[in-house]
Amino acid sequence: MKALWHTLWQGQDIAVCRDSVEVDRFNAQQIERVLLLHRGTGDSPGDVVQVVIELTDHCLVFSADTGIAGRINFERQSYWAERGCVHWVNIARAPLPLRLRTGHGLLRLSPPPFARVARADVAGMIAKWPVQGAQTWDERKRLRIERAQPLSFEHA
């Protein structure tokens, strides 16, 4: 039977659980940057495939199935807006070490739902990613709506 991974807020910490047993925990104040890796344009919450959270010495890599994207996009929104640390990257332009990569089509890779890796091991790769943001989900949605609006002219 497949293990059930999930994340949840506990005070100022985010706990990572496997089958309801806590396996990791980190304080949200330690987060330096959140990278939401998405397919397509990233305009839908379902486009987020993986999340990389950069701490001082480690990177935490989550699959979307853990619910971490929901913790970032829809819970404590004012906290994330104030922090200005949420960024977006198209997954096609965001290579990770093979064991952490997700895939589709003929290349169906199955990365672990959660991994804590030394930041030094992935920093060189992440530095080359074309990062967008900082912007929360609400800011991203608002920009998408504005881009879809026909040009409007104000009359003096």
Indicate where each model-derived feature is located.
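Eukaryotic intrinsically disordered, low-complexity regulatory linkers and tails enriched in Ser/Thr/Pro
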Residues: M1-A156
